[in-house]
Amino acid sequence: MTTFTRRTFVQSTLATGALAGSGLLEWAKAWAQAAPWKPEKGAQLSLLRWKYFVQSEDDAFMALLDAFTKATGVKVTVTRESFEDIPPKASVAANTNAGPDLFWGLQSLPHLFPQKCVDVTDVADYLGKKYGGWVPSAVTYGKSGSKWIDIPVCVSGNMMNYRISALKKAGLTKFPATTDEFLEYAKATKRNNTPGGMALGHATGDANCWVYWCLWAHGGNLVDKNDKVILNSPETVKALEYAKQLYDNMIPGVASWNDAFNNKVFLAGEISWTNNGISIYAAAKRDPTKKDIAEDMDHALWPVGPIGKPTEFHVCFPMLAMTYTKYPQASKALMAFLLEADNYNKWLEGSVGYLTHPLNAYDNNPVWTSDPKNTIFREAAKRTLTVGGLGSVGEKAAAALADFILVDMFANVCTGREDPKAAIKIAERQATRLYR
């Protein structure tokens, strides 16, 4: 496997200093002088982001912030929260007009409070024109009406992670391509004492990704194109019945998993398949004691369900600035700075495939071809459906995701708390309150 010099930089303990001192700072100073966004006098920014899963991604990110500060004089203070803690903290900040200047969260977060997001249409237009245009999912997540309320910084591909040896033991040479094949594979791995598992707790990334995929794969939907709730359908029942069978062949305990649990149990050798980003593989490669796992795992696309087409749901990471910030120009400058090629290419390599680009110009970044096990993640931003499904991505769809309406519906059936019809009724009632 080829290791690229820039990746070596960001994985070292001196990553921040190395990147900032290797030409990045001089470029950043020139950029700051030419950029249309001039930070306000005395500007300082606070940013709340999700807790990283790949150390070298965060190293590269902090290196870029360091260069931005030295070039503009704007200090950026970063705090980190788990996926599930960001929506409530951002909502409180929006309601009280107090908190971090910027939030870097998940999926449709800005659409929980679109009127509290700084209009960043100028930044989005600048980046889109310069870097080959935005992928469709980024436009959907970025815009509210005719204006951009956030910058979709990246997408984390949520793919199937699996152990190659367990796949072969189950009698297969490639990962299942259909939901029927996937169920048989789950049964076989359980029989072989190499079960898999997918989160069914309030895991903002992993749990939502697989239950939305499952619902859509069977033709079910939360709402129609007019945002009318249509959850109560035979297709939803089929999706729940299928999920129950999958669950019965998973490792026990997934109903309490958050976004970190499957990483831990996969790396501990307790499961042989799960849905996740590239962070499990990245951690295994980084840890000399997990080399055997890194060599014995790979990634696959989600199986296609009865509707006959992909229904993947990957994790978008939008960045927004709150309207209460005293420094909107500094906030815009930071967003634009991060996605400039001289910065973003290094960051992508530092993320070792965990982050996927939403701008077409970055298709040729070497991270996608340096390791064949990374390549599948390159298309995540282009393949993903968006949180609204058939409907719009707005406050209602964002609230349904944040409230785990579909996750709880699936969990109620899988754990036996409710039968499918009763679980659908509960979820339908919750969704109707949001969409009225």
Which role fits each region the language model picked out?
Residues 37-39, 75-76, 168, 383-436:
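Conserved C-terminal helix/tail region of periplasmic/extracytoplasmic solute-binding proteins
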Residues 185-188, 226-255, 298:
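Glycine-centered hinge/linker elements that transmit conformational signals in sensory
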